[in-house]
């Protein structure tokens, strides 16, 4: 239904969802555009420490890409090695990772940016603890600078909080080390920004 809703809309949209594949359950993001499911990206790093115990439910992403059946005879790509490109804008190459993937020692986005991704999208349910908002902001800025990319971070909102964890919709957009937009924690704002992908391509050629 969500894919059908995007028909006629020239916008790349990512949604989070659980996906069952070959007997295992994965925490995934689906890329939607123009009524199509362009790909499904599973989460690579599954946290199982502190307040996180995702391994009770989810398996880490398998290596490589595979075909995933959708409906009728239609299929899509399932895997982490995907870049979503705009044929009219050569600089636009979008990769996706999920929450803990960014906080890991070697995030999947390191591989994605090395393969040409200029924008990395992160669908996150990052809970709030003392000092975490500032650390999160610092982490995103450093990661986007180190990998010369734009990093778009969408966080779970207050309505998704439970008795165990609190979420604050701390959305962020960073570009090559600079913070472009921020939706403050526990607010009602949105993070929106215009990205200079041509400048990032120029920076990459210089490095």
Indicate where each model-derived feature is located.
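Enzyme catalytic cores with a strong preference for nitrogen-chemistry domains
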Residues: 1-207
């Amino acid at each position: 239904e969500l894919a059908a809703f995007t028909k006629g809309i020239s916008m790349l949209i990512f949604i989070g969802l659980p996906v069952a594949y070959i007997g295992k359950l994965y925490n995934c993001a689906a890329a939607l555009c123009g009524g199509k499911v362009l790909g499904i990206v599973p989460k690579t790093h599954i946290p199982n420490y502190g307040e996180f115990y995702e391994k009770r439910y989810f398996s880490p992403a398998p290596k490589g890409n595979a075909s995933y059946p959708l409906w009728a005879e239609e299929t899509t790509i399932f895997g982490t090695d995907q870049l979503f490109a705009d044929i009219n804008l050569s600089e636009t190459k979008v990769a996706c990772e999920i929450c803990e993937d960014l906080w890991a020692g070697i995030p999947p986005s390191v591989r994605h940016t090395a393969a040409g991704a200029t924008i990395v999208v992160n669908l996150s349910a990052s809970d709030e603890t003392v000092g975490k908002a500032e650390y999160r902001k610092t982490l995103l800025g450093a990661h986007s600078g180190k990998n010369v990319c734009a990093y778009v971070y969408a966080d779970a909102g207050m309505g998704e909080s439970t008795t165990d964890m609190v979420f604050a919709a701390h959305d962020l957009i960073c570009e090559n080390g600079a913070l472009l937009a921020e939706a403050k924690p526990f607010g009602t704002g949105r993070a929106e920004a215009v990205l200079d992908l041509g400048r990032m391509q120029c920076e990459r050629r210089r490095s």
